[in-house]
């Protein structure tokens, strides 16, 4: 496959991943991990998905290690881990 074809395929896969709605059954497994600040001493405002409250919450990330349940914005956390609300149109 040519590099142009691979680039097109990558673009289509990225678009599909962004537009596919998240449900509780296909939510990524890392969304169920606890917030992990990591071992370093930076002070980075981040967000994690709290599977008990079903909300994205703020925490302070130390800058290294940690886990994949770590997002730079609340919106990115919601897009990745939170199921859309039923009966609500946006």
Swiss-Prot record:
Cellular component terms (Gene Ontology): extracellular space
Tissue occurrence: Expressed by the venom gland.
Residues covered by the BPTI/Kunitz inhibitor domain: 31-81
A Pfam family: Kunitz_BPTI
PANTHER family xrefs: KUNITZ-TYPE PROTEASE INHIBITOR-RELATED, SERINE PEPTIDASE INHIBITOR, KUNITZ TYPE, 3
Function in brief: Serine protease inhibitor.
Protein name from the UniProt record: Kunitz-type serine protease inhibitor C4
